[in-house]
C-alpha cells in the first residue's frame, strides 16, 4: 500500500480520476495536523455515517469519502495486516451480541490475534447490566451504575434510583478512556425528567460467569425493605384497610379491575440492587390473579409481616380479604441460596409418581411413553408401511423402516465414509474406530461396544432364555440362534 498518501491526495492519488478537471481539495497544514490528532474512532464513525446530498458533486463526495477512509485506516502508518485486522474487527463488532462488544471495548482489543486470545482465556468483566432506557437496550458495567451502594431509603424510591443513575451517567467526562468507551455503548443522556425516571427499567442483569446456579436478578428488593423495617420499627405497621372502591366492586362482578403497578422481587445476593418494573396487566374475576399494590414512595410489607397467623407463601390482596369473589395472589417460589422452599404444612414437596405399567410394573416418566409401551402387551401396532404392510408401534419406527425401501442412508461415518440408515447404528460403528467400550457387565466387569451385546452376555449369568420355540419348546438366549433354529423346522417340513 502506498506510503506517500497525504490528506491532499497529491499527483497519482486515488481520487484523481482520469479526465477529471475538477480542482482537488487541498487541506492546509493546520487542518492536517488537527485531523491526525483526532481519535481514529471518530474518523471511523465519520466514514461510516457519511452521506452525500443529491445536489452535491459526486466527485467531491468520492474524494471526501476517500479522505475519511484514509484518516481512519491510516495506510501511511499501518501495515496491510493491521488494516485487515481493523476491517475484520469492525465486522466482528457489528455481528456479535452486545456482551462480546462490551468485552472487546473494555479490554481495548486492537487485533484479531488479541481477540482470539481474549476469547480463549475468557477474560471478561465481573459483571455488567443490560439497561432498558426509553425502549432501547444498552450495556453498562455495574461499577458505573453504582446501584449496589445506594442506601435503603434511596432504593425504596424508584424515581430517586433512576435520577441517581442519570446523574452518574451525566458526570462521566469525555476525556477519560473509560468514559469514552462507555459512550460508545450508551448514548449521552442530557437530562432525564422525573417522569422518564419512573419509566426507567433495569430489566435484565447478565452474570458472565456462566454459573447456572448463580442468583438471578429479581430477588433483593423485598429483603432490603424487610431489613429497613427492622432498623425503623415504624415501617412495620400493617397496611391500612383501603375503602371499598368501584374497582373492587367491578372485580367481584368479574369485570376488568384498574391496572396496577408492581415492584417485583429481586435477588438478595445480586449486587445491582434495585430493579423496578411497571406492569399494566388486565385481570378477570374468573382467573383469580392480582398484583401487589405498591407505592413508589413507600415500601409495602410482605405477606409474613402483614399477618403472622397466615402460612408462609400465602397472601391476599389489600382491601376486603374475606371477599370470596376477589382475586387472590398466586405466589411463585424460586429456590435460592437459603435452601429449599418451605410449604404451608411444613411438608416437603413430593415428586409426581411415575407412570407404571399395570402388566409388568415398568415405570415411565411421561404418560406418552407408557402408552407406547402398553402396545407391546396388547399387540396394537397402528402405524403400517404402505409398501410391505409391516406394522409398527410408533411413527418414528415406521419412518426409519421406510428407509429400507427408499435406500436412504442419511448417517455417514466421518472416518471410512460408510453410510447407515439408523443413527444408533452409526454411533455403534464409530466405536470400531475409537475402540470405545462403554457398556460394562455388572457381574464380571467385561466391557462391550454395543448395549445389545451386553444384554446377551448378562443372560449367561442370569440364565435367562427369552426366545422359546413354539414347535419343540426349546429356549434360546440369542435372537439370531433362535431364528436359525426356526429354519430347521421349516426345512424339515418342506422335505
Swiss-Prot record:
Keywords for the protein's UniProt record, in alphabetical order: DNA-binding, Metal-binding, Nucleus, Repeat, Transcription, Transcription regulation, Zinc, Zinc-finger
Region (Disordered): 1-40, 150-183, 227-347
Chain positions of all zinc fingers (C2H2-type): 355-377, 383-405, 411-433, 439-461, 467-489
InterPro entries reported for this sequence: SCAN_dom, SCAN_sf, Zinc_finger, Znf_C2H2_sf, Znf_C2H2_type
SUPFAM superfamilies linked to this entry: beta-beta-alpha zinc fingers, Retrovirus capsid dimerization domain-like
Pfam families: SCAN, zf-C2H2, zf-met
Biased composition (Polar residues): 17-34, 161-173, 292-310
UniProt GO BP: regulation of transcription by RNA polymerase II
GO MF, one annotated term: DNA-binding transcription factor activity, RNA polymerase II-specific
SCAN box domain mapped to chain residues: 44-126
Locations listed in the record: Nucleus
Organism domain of life: Eukaryota
GO CC annotation: nucleus
Ranges of compositional bias, category Basic and acidic residues: 250-262
Purpose of the protein: May be involved in transcriptional regulation.
Name this protein carries in UniProt: Zinc finger and SCAN domain-containing protein 5B
Organismal lineage: Eukaryota, Metazoa, Chordata, Craniata, Vertebrata
